[in-house]
């Protein structure tokens, strides 16, 4: 029997490239042993060995791979781009650090506020992004970029419709695809968009980077408008800034409570970190959990917490972005209602506690449960969905009620308030989610089949199938509304 063919990349010299990258990281790790290199997150001393270990796992998995199902934009292309970028960024770090055995050279890199220190901090952030990206697309070394589930449903549909199973695209191609849905003027604005999206600074956009971007600048219908107001025009936005640098920058405003700046979190990619001066002059940093930044800033302004962006008097008005989204509807068939009734239950009842109604939706898998059960589940250090074991990347407060039938033209008018690209995307199903463990708790979902015809599919949810014990006759469906509603969400203080 002939031996199984190795992946194409493995045959083209990929093993040597991976080995060379690991050796480079090991050399950099030796240069970072100076005690003065101990900094807040992200720390090169921590990132370099972790990245080297993950690359070793990738090499092992690639060596043992029996087939190579990925085409253009798959594992081969991603690794070629990743390793080339790693070599470039690694050399830049090596030039900034003192050579081995010459500790008296390049001393400016250890001086707080120096240009060399700032360059090193930015490179540490890039290495942090690269490690997070590799971990997301190659968990435990095994490629799963073609199965990657974006957190926001509309973003997932956009990527899979336009990019298929590819996990990485050249910037020029991605730019044209995005602009077809969200137009952007060429020139400085387009360049600013590239610098925000391209977290690893390699001239490409991966599905992971797009996921982070869409989580930061949600909701989808006004994605780039949100980005322009928050990242381009807002004086409080800081790109590529670390926890320590935020503390340093706000020192100048300790006598001006209400001063604040915000940045993408480097420890929780896809979420925001806000640094601000409290009423007693303390400098605090917090990460709002699963809530759009513009809502957090507006509430902070109302409460007198976020008043002076980067110490400036003018606080931009973000109210134009806080519009109520149209209701998101899901459909429950009559047979499903009968099934719930047979179990002495209802659709809206949380299937974990069986006491409270569902009021929160887990992202990206879309499962519904009550916020109390979700909080208790996460307090037990469980960061995966209790139904499908998909990673919990976000959550959305919802309100469930049985809807009254509306005339078709009225329903269409409400739905039409979303942009065309969003409307088209909403008519497609989400891609598959591969759970890491079997479900342990009851599951909810609606059956797929011929009876689905005519159902509204705005913002469809990827939920597990609920199978009835006996076949039931097809009956008319009943419309339910799952309504996103604003509610206060807890905030977590960033401790690292």
UniProtKB/Swiss-Prot annotation:
The modification Phosphotyrosine is found at residue 340. GO terms for molecular function: calcium ion binding; epidermal growth factor receptor binding; phosphotyrosine residue binding; SH3 domain binding; ubiquitin protein ligase activity; zinc ion binding. Phosphorylation at Tyr-340 is necessary and sufficient for the activation of E3 activity. GO terms for biological process: cell surface receptor signaling pathway; negative regulation of epidermal growth factor receptor signaling pathway; negative regulation of MAPK cascade; negative regulation of neuron apoptotic process; protein catabolic process; protein stabilization; protein ubiquitination; response to glial cell derived neurotrophic factor. SUPFAM superfamilies: EF-hand (SSF47473), N-terminal domain of cbl (N-cbl) (SSF47668), RING/U-box (SSF57850), SH2 domain (SSF55550). Residues 7-144 are annotated as: 4H. A zinc finger (RING-type) spans 350-389. InterPro entries: Adaptor_Cbl, Adaptor_Cbl_EF_hand-like, Adaptor_Cbl_N_dom_sf, Adaptor_Cbl_N_hlx, Adaptor_Cbl_SH2-like, Cbl_PTB, EF-hand-dom_pair, SH2_dom_sf. Keywords: Calcium, Metal-binding, Phosphoprotein, Repeat, SH3-binding, Transferase, Ubl conjugation, Ubl conjugation pathway, Zinc, Zinc-finger. Residues 7-320 form the Cbl-PTB domain. It comes from the Eukaryota. Residues 321-349 are annotated as: Linker. Disruption phenotype: No visible phenotype. Gene3D superfamilies: Adaptor protein Cbl, N-terminal domain, EF-hand, SH2 domain, Zinc/RING finger domain, C3HC4 (zinc finger). It is an enzyme of class 2 (transferase). Residues 145-217 are annotated as: EF-hand-like. Residues 218-320 are annotated as: SH2-like. Disulfide bonds: none annotated. Phosphorylated on tyrosines by EGFR. Signal peptide: none annotated. Ca(2+) binds at residues 198, 200, 202, 209. EF-hand-like and Sh2-like domains are required for N-terminal inhibition of E3 activity. This protein has one functional calcium-binding site. This is E3 ubiquitin-protein ligase CBL-C. The lineage of its organism: Eukaryota, Metazoa, Chordata, Craniata, Vertebrata. The gene is Cblc.
């Amino acid at each position: 029997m002939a031996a199984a063919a190795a992946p194409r990349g493995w045959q083209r010299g990929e093993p040597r490239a991976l080995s060379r990258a690991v050796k480079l990281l090991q050399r950099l790790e030796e240069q970072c042993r100076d005690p003065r290199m101990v900094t807040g997150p992200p720390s090169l001393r921590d990132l370099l060995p972790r990245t080297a270990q993950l690359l070793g796992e990738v090499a092992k998995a690639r060596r043992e791979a029996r087939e190579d199902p990925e085409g253009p934009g798959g594992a081969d292309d991603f690794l070629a781009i990743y390793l080339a970028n790693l070599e470039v960024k690694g050399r830049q770090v090596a030039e900034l650090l003192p050579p081995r055995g010459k500790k008296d050279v390049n001393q400016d890199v250890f001086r707080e506020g120096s240009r060399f220190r700032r360059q090193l901090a930015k490179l540490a952030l890039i290495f942090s992004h690269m490690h997070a990206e590799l971990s997301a697309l190659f968990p435990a070394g095994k490629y799963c970029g073609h199965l990657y589930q974006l957190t926001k449903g509309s973003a997932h549909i956009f990527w899979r419709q336009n990019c298929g199973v590819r996990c990485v695209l050249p910037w020029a191609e991605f730019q044209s695809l995005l602009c077809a849905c969200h137009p952007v003027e060429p020139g400085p604005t387009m360049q600013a968009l590239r610098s925000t999206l391209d977290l690893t600074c390699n001239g490409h956009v991966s599905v992971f980077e797009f996921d982070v971007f869409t989580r930061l600048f949600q909701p989808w219908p006004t994605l780039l408008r949100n980005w322009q107001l928050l990242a381009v025009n807002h004086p409080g936005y800081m790109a590529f800034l670390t926890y320590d640098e935020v503390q340093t920058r706000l020192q100048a405003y300790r006598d001006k409570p209400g001063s604040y700046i915000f940045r993408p979190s480097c420890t929780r990619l896809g979420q925001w970190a806000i640094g601000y001066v409290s009423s007693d002059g303390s400098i605090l940093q917090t990460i709002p959990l699963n809530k759009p930044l513009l809502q957090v800033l507006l509430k902070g302004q109302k409460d007198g917490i976020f008043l002076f962006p980067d110490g400036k008097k003018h606080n931009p008005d973000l109210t134009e972005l806080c519009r109520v989204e149209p209701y998101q509807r899901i459909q429950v068939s009559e047979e499903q209602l009968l099934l719930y009734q047979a179990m002495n239950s209802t659709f809206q009842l949380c299937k974990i506690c069986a006491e409270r109604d569902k009021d929160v939706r887990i992202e990206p898998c879309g499962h519904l449960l009550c916020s109390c059960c979700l909080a208790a589940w996460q307090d037990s250090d469980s960061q995966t969905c209790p139904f499908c074991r998909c990673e919990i990347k976000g959550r959305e407060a919802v309100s469930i009620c049985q809807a009254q039938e509306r005339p078709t033209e009225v329903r269409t008018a409400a739905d039409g308030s979303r942009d065309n690209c969003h409307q088209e995307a909403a008519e497609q199903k989400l891609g598959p989610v591969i759970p890491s463990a079997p479900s342990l708790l009851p599951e909810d979902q609606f059956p797929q089949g011929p009876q689905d015809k005519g159902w509204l599919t705005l913002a469809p949810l990827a939920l597990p199938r609920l199978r009835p014990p006996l076949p039931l006759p097809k009956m008319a469906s009943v419309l339910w509304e799952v309504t996103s509603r604003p509610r206060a969400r807890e905030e977590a203080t960033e401790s690292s």
